[in-house]
Design a protein with these regions (language model features):
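Left-handed beta-helix
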Residues: 144, 151-368
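Unchanged
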Residues: 1-202, 309-315, 319-320, 326-327, ...
Length: 368
């Protein structure tokens, strides 16, 4: 697993992989951040560059095949089926693909194939796509092919699989095939898609089903107390972790472990992560609250008009969401608009007229 920016939470979550049966003597999980090398050192500058910087690690195992996965996608796939497809076609590279609406295809790398599923053309995020068969960012490489391509393109700035490795391999005539996948798949690389994918989990029969007996989802569990739901609490369509205390209302929301929602509070269409606290009579609408945050009493988060662009990062803090960073404190009696971001221990003096208008950003320390 290759990590980079602020990896502590992910590293802690994965650990040595016990919940996924990955704590093995042979194989298992290794977390590989960028590191100081004898010749040079730098952060990973692209997806393929990250693999290249760990070439020695792969050479130690000398695999026959290398499976490369993105870390911000949600789906269920049996990779053995894809590997069998790769072997049956004597492929050098197999790329997992999924049909998407043609009007959305420009967001992805797309490919054109022949009747045998061999890729004839590949375009990375074309302005005018000629195919709706989109790359899922999942690849199987025969090891010698991958190694040679990485070495040849090692000086390519920001070396990326879609932009550089695949076109290079296609131009030299490698056998590249498209493995078509038709299940649920979502790229959660934006706050909007992350929020949307969480909201989909609380449908009566979610498209991405967490409850299938034949395909269980495992995670790292904390050993804490059971949930407590007060007699006056109102809960409608919600997923809640262990240790929650719910005294107010929760509607269509995902609530992490050890969260407290106090009396009179109303939470709608929101994601509240572990160990957050929502004060009395506070209203949350389309909010993402990070771990350990404290929201005061009599607050309103998600107030006012829709679609006011965020002034600092309009492409990030969007989708009419309120984004609250880890261990943030919001004082009592504050009203916060949409497309906003708040981080740090804020006080009432940080809110003119007790308000943070839509599209504003308030960051007291660090960054988001």
């Amino acid at each position: 697993m290759l990590t980079q920016y602020q990896p502590l939470k992910l590293n802690t979550h994965i650990g040595i992989g016990i919940p996924w049966d990955l704590d093995r003597n042979i194989g298992g999980v290794s977390i590989l951040p960028p590191y100081e090398r004898s010749t040079s050192s730098e952060w990973y500058t692209g997806t393929a560059n990250a693999i290249y910087q760990n070439l020695n690690y792969m050479e130690y195992y000398n695999p026959d095949y290398v499976l490369i996965l993105g870390g911000d996608h949600i789906y269920k796939m049996d990779y053995q089926v894809m590997l069998d497809f790769h072997k049956a076609n004597h492929a050098d590279i197999t790329m997992a693909t999924i049909p998407v609406p043609i009007e959305e295809a420009s967001r992805f790398g797309v490919c054109i194939t022949d009747d045998t599923h061999r890729i004839l053309e590949f375009e990375e995020k074309p302005e005018h796509p000629r195919s709706n068969l989109a790359s899922m960012g999942i690849y199987i490489f025969s090891w010698p092919v991958l190694k040679e391509a990485l070495i040849q393109l090692k000086d390519q700035k920001g070396c990326d699989f879609g932009k550089h490795i695949l076109p290079y391999c296609h131009e030299r005539g490698d056998r590249i095939f498209a493995f078509e996948y038709n299940g649920y798949w979502k790229d959660v690389g934006t706050l909007g898609s992350y929020w949307e994918s969480n909201m989909e989990l609380i449908d009566l029969i979610p498209v991405f089903n967490l409850y299938e007996e034949f395909w269980k989802i495992y995670t790292s569990n904390e050993w804490i107390r059971p949930q407590y739901i007060a007699g006056d609490a109102v809960i409608d369509k919600a997923i809640m972790g262990d240790g929650c205390e719910i005294y107010g209302e929760v509607h269509s929301s995902v609530i992490g472990s050890d969260v407290v929602i106090e009396e009179g509070a109303v939470v709608r269409d929101s994601i509240i992560m572990n160990s957050a606290r929502i004060g009395k009579n506070t209203v949350l609408d389309r909010a993402i609250i990070a771990e350990g945050s404290i929201i005061g009493e009599n607050c309103v988060l998600g107030a006012g008009e829709d679609d006011i662009p965020n002034k600092l990062k309009p492409d990030v803090y969007a989708f009419n969401l309120v984004t609250v960073g880890e261990k943030t404190v919001i004082p009592d009696g504050v009203t916060i608009g949409k497309n906003t971001a708040i981080a740090g221990k804020t006080t009432i003096d940080d809110y003119p007229d007790n308000t943070l208008a839509g599209g504003e950003t308030l960051i007291k320390a660090g960054d988001m």
